[in-house]
Amino acid sequence: MEVKIEQVNRKFISNSNYVFRKILNSEDCLGIIKNFIEAILDIKIKEIELNPYLKQKENYLPREENFGIADVRIHTYENEEMNVGIQFIDGIYVQTKMLMYYSQIHLNQLEYGDNREFAKTITINLLDFNYFSSKGCKKTIRIKTNEGDVRLEEIEMISIELPKFRCYDNDDLTEIEQWLQYLKGCDENTLEKIKSQNKYIKKLDTLAEKYWLEEKME
């Protein structure tokens, strides 16, 4: 399969998972994560909390397992409880990385130590290249398994191929269009429109600018 590489928003192209993780893994940024997940999954979140696994383990994981931006537990207004993981994937072993990441986020629940029941897990996988043959930029992958008469939990993974995203009216963007256009990268005029429409993207962009400024100063 031919993999066509295109650049994501340049604020995040250098080790995107690491940069996003440094910026977003704090209580102050939960609103940003919440807004992103609501836009991608088309849900309304009542409660959201960071799961501590990434922060606690990132220095001890092998490089091939040290991926992911955020690992959160959410409660929706429809009384659903689930874990959501978000990661960028590079162009190598894409399907393997998607499955490994899903497994990591789902099994992270063993680390909580607060007697919570296992909940459904969904992962959001961001690709800055074309990988699947489908034309749409967003793809939902579900894997159903059965063991005898017992139906095991459905695996659900979302993939978003940013280069496939197209928007033809930058003056009236939906929330998911705002996020995908921002992550894909856009001209300054479009960026300013997006930031005027979405305060969470505006905050993330400010934090990204601050991050790179501090990196240069160090």
Question: Which stretches of residues belong to each language-model region?
Answer:
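Elongated, amphipathic alpha-helical interaction scaffolds
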Residues: M1-E218
